[in-house]
């Protein structure tokens, strides 16, 4: 199982989303939509072995975590507007500590960024923090029977405190490129690496 989590520092936390202004008034929701596209959509299929989390810390009610489960997703199209509509529906529900399903395979809760990561660590997943200054990809060995969580930052990053937290729990800091990449591009590169193990 491949799982991805992004800390979305400015992404809105209610359903008041302007579909005509995803990058601006919605707190870079366009970035999240592209990440969902990259996490799940193939040319004529969907990735069923993937889960994607977005932990939104924007106004008015942070945090709200969205969870997308590839094996359960239905009716979502790959374009940003379609994905944004499904995100809007999820954010219209009052989030609590428990996961609430808004549409097939899409859930919301009030879980924190660190809580999700600790939960995955306790499940035995290898935790990778994707960072420009990490160890080169070539220095790591991946096995097909392992479960992974890949931690991503948005255009702002995850912040010093969360970086220290990842270091404390033993997350492996990995660099996919000598150049700074968009989060959605990182997801595609990770998929490509793991696809080749099969």
UniProtKB/Swiss-Prot annotation:
Tell me which domain of life the UniProt entry assigns to the organism this sequence originates from.
Archaea
**CDD domains reported for this sequence:** TrmY-like
Q: Provide the catalytic activity annotation.
A: pseudouridine(54) in tRNA + S-adenosyl-L-methionine = N(1)-methylpseudouridine(54) in tRNA + S-adenosyl-L-homocysteine + H(+)
**Database matches in SUPFAM superfamilies:** alpha/beta knot
Enzyme Commission number? 2.1.1.257
Record-listed S-adenosyl-L-methionine binding positions: 130, 153, 176-181, 186
Q: What keywords appear on the UniProt entry? A: Cytoplasm, Methyltransferase, S-adenosyl-L-methionine, Transferase, tRNA processing
Can you say what this protein is called?
tRNA (pseudouridine(54)-N(1))-methyltransferase
High-level lineage:
Archaea, Methanobacteriati, Methanobacteriota, Methanomada group, Methanococci
The gene that this protein is the product of is: trmY
């Amino acid at each position: 199982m491949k799982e991805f989590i992004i800390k979305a520092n400015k992404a809105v936390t209610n359903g008041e989303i302007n579909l005509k202004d995803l990058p601006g008034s919605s707190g870079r929701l366009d970035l999240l939509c592209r990440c969902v596209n990259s996490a799940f959509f193939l040319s004529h299929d969907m990735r069923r072995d993937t889960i994607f989390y977005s932990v939104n810390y924007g106004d008015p009610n942070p945090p709200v975590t969205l969870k997308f489960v590839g094996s359960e997703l239905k009716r979502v199209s790959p374009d940003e507007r379609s994905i944004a509509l499904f995100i809007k529906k999820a954010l219209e529900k009052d989030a609590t500590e428990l996961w609430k399903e808004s549409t097939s395979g899409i859930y919301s809760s009030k879980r924190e960024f660190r809580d999700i990561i600790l939960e995955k660590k306790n499940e035995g997943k290898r935790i990778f923090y994707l960072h420009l200054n990490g160890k080169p990809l070539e220095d790591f060995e991946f096995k097909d029977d392992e479960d992974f969580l890949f931690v991503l930052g948005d255009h702002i990053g995850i912040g010093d405190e969360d970086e220290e937290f990842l270091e404390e729990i033993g997350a492996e800091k990995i660099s996919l490129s000598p150049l700074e990449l968009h989060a959605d591009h990182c997801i595609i590169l990770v998929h490509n690496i793991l696809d080749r193990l099969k």
